[in-house]
């Protein structure tokens, strides 16, 4: 189990992952806060749940809770570099669902409600799931602690 966790948190990605992970993590967290808490002009769980139900994602409230939690908590974890690979994988899955359930029928461009923004977030989170946190991450502290015990 220790070897699995060490492999999960280890990364040689350097500074590039940090440059991706912090702004994308904070952006995801802000979007999650819109869904969960109605912050930043969002609709909260009730409004987001109704929207998700209208897309056929039922039960809407639960889907809003799952998507909002993945974005908010996953985004914070990405920004900190805490369990980066699992947080990025969950975020990538969330973006894939968003692309195919809410945006694909609107085409590529965001100005028409398209999927370009979710696609960029998907690409970045897949990249982070592969590379790991990089430098200046809580994952590195965990990896060092596991290798010294």
Annotate each predicted stretch with a short phrase.
Residues 1-39, 61-69, 73-149:
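Extended, low-polarity transmembrane helix blocks
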Residues 38-59:
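Membrane-interface interhelical connector segments
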